[in-house]
A protein has these predicted regions:
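Histidine/acidic-residue-rich, glycine-tolerant segments that coordinate divalent metal ions
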Residues: 1-89, 94-100, 183-184
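Metal-dependent amide/peptide-bond hydrolase catalytic core
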Residues: 60-241
Length: 241
């Protein structure tokens, strides 16, 4: 994209349920976290559930891995350095009387700082391997690096906030809101070019129907505010040239 088209700055917007409709939030730094995900296979030796001593139980090893990984955030990460590690899938076995050969599990890791992101990956690798080995199992990890943190550039964030104030009024612009542990692919653009990513308030939603829920209903009433922001931003940027 950037090799084919010359760009000086990049700008993004996302509607944000929970923020009052028509209000705007702007961060002068990180607004959303990185998002990596992983899948691992814990391999033991299957056998009869009534004779566990004759096999190597990957279910027990996987359970201990899940528990051990929770320490990476709760005990090995500065509480002021927000991060999340969630195990979201675990599968193994198909019969009540058979210890399976393997168990697969997976999840996601979120962080705001690149060094925290890298450390959590390495720690997850080490803890999973060592825990599996302590049970006589092996582990194969497939780590997939996803989105980087969404980090606004300060100068552009200030310009975005000025435009927002011109559109909705100073009392309806929120500076440096609490960052979200969600992730955003616009982060790649912010790594390549200066820019800012804002949240446009969509108001309250029905309980349980947040973004990405199949029952989510976009608030059409915020469209004029969003389009006014874009038009005013363009006018402001062109006037400064």
């Amino acid at each position: 994209l950037f090799s084919d088209h010359q760009m000086e700055t990049v700008w993004g917007m996302h509607n944000w349920p929970g923020l009052p409709a028509g209000e705007i939030a702007v961060s002068e730094g990180a607004s959303m976290a990185s998002a990596d995900h992983f899948e691992m296979t814990v391999t033991g030796r299957g056998g009869h559930a009534a004779m566990p001593h004759q096999g190597i139980d990957p279910v027990l090893a996987a359970a201990h891995i899940v528990q051990a990984l929770q320490m990476l955030v709760s005990r090995h990460t500065n509480p002021q350095d927000s991060s999340v590690l969630s195990i979201t899938t675990i599968h193994g076995g198909s019969a009540f009387n058979v210890i399976p050969d393997e168990v697969t599990l997976g999840g996601t890791v979120r962080a705001f700082r690149p060094e925290t992101r890298a450390r959590l990956e390495q720690s997850l690798r080490d803890v999973s391997r060592l825990t599996a080995e302590s049970h006589g199992c092996t582990v194969a990890l497939d780590w997939r690096q996803g989105y980087p943190p969404t980090v606004n550039h300060q100068a552009e964030a200030i310009r975005a906030a000025d435009v927002a104030r011109a559109v909705v009024g100073a009392d309806r612009v929120h500076m440096n809101p609490e960052p979200s542990m969600g992730a955003e692919d616009f982060a790649f653009m912010l790594e390549a070019k200066p820019g800012a990513y804002i949240w446009l308030g969509a108001g309250e939603t029905e309980v349980g129907r947040m973004l990405h829920n199949t029952g989510y209903d976009f608030n059409d009433e915020i469209l004029p505010t969003g389009t006014s922001y874009w038009a005013t931003l363009v006018e402001s940027e062109l006037a400064a040239k």
